[in-house]
Amino acid sequence: MLFENRITSLFKIDLPIIQAGMVWASGWELASAVSNAGGLGIIGAGSMYPEVLRTHIQKTKTATTKPFAVNLPMLYPDLQAHINIIIEEKVPIVFTSAGIKKHGLQPLKKMELQWYML
C-alpha cells in the first residue's frame, strides 16, 4: 500500500481516496478508473434501472480486480431490485444514503460485505 491508515486498511485500497457516488456521473468507467488508480471507486445507483445497475457492476468487475462499491440511495423506488442485484453480483462494499429503511435491508445484513450508511 502506498499509504497505510485506517481507510486504506478498511477498504484494502492503496490511497485514502473514496470517490463520491454521484448519481449520473459515477458509472462503471469512473468507478473502475478510481479503483485502478488505488482509491475506492463507487457506482452511483440512484439514477439506474435495476438491469442498468447490473451491467455497470459487471463492467466494473471486468475493468478492475480492485475493491469497488455501490452507493444505494434509500429513496429509490425499486430498492428491493437493487438490493437483489447487489447480492447476486456479490458487490464487496455498499454505501446506503438518503435515509434509512427499517425493512427490506435484512438480505444485505446477511451478506459477507462491508455496509456503511451515509
Model-derived segments and spans:
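Active-site entrance/lid segments in N-terminal catalytic domains of soluble metabolic enzymes
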Residues: 1-118
